[in-house]
Amino acid sequence: MTAIPPQLIVEPDDGLEPVHAFISSAQRSLLIKQFTFTEPSLIAATIARRKAGVDVRVMLNAQRSGGDRANDDTYQELKHAGVDVQWSSPHFYVTHEKSIVVDEKAAMVATYNLMIKYFTLTRDYGIITHDPVHVQQIIDVFNADWGHREFTPAEDGGLLWSNSNSRYQMARFIDKASETLHIQH
């Protein structure tokens, strides 16, 4: 069986379509964890999946570090449509993660929020992976955060998790560079 290669999404070049298509591809389950989720067509796609019988859970960051609450309207709209939605874990100052998991088989991790400006004005990236180890780890963290439980990542899980292993893993990655290292921040 051939592994499905990762799909890179480059914004603003690729626009909304790859994200919309990914959300719309969910047949059994859809997990969305977002720092900011206000883009109307993506909210509608999420609600459409719920209306199609998909088990949808959405976790939103309650407020930004400055105190503004960008997700309140989205929270209410999703809740009203029957989507299982809740605020992210209070264990963290903010939840800055941007992830979407479809059918427990594929995960999108991105630097962009689900807001129109990230698909039209800013340089951001996303990747869709089918790597079962990575997908499962994203699900495990989602479930831990959903239940407000601690999560300790595996040392070599392949993913970096802030407040856990990110500094160690990032330093290890940088140390492995033998000729070049390109960083965009």
Feature locations, PLM:
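HKD-type phospholipase D/PLD-like phosphodiesterase module
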Residues: 1-27, 33-178
